[in-house]
């Protein structure tokens, strides 16, 4: 297994430790784990492209690894009342629609590349989570900023999902 793939696997392995730290109210540890895991997301793709180490494993496993990390944090925020549950349902619905469309396209031999709006959505979600971890814990003054970034990520989630469906509507006739 090459280094980028190891980083992707590491990100997935870190999720239960992040959840445990957050639930134990070890917010600094949860914060550090989430930041490290988020950095592995940035590094795995850069290393894979720079060193010509792009693999099917990486292409397939990187997006779910990101989602497992971010959505586990969002579930924790719903559980403690930081964000409303309906927002998580919108986010998950977008992911199911996009993933379903990608699966149908792939079954026809078509690869649909990730759009910039989807990448922006992911970055906004990660930034919101990072701020909200600290806001729920030691620095509650950051909650307003964290929630503003979260709402921006929700808008980008809806926008990127809509853009994806409209650009790839031919998938519905496959």
Region locations from a protein language model:
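Alpha-helical transmembrane bundles and membrane-interface segments of multipass inner-membrane proteins
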Residues: 1-174
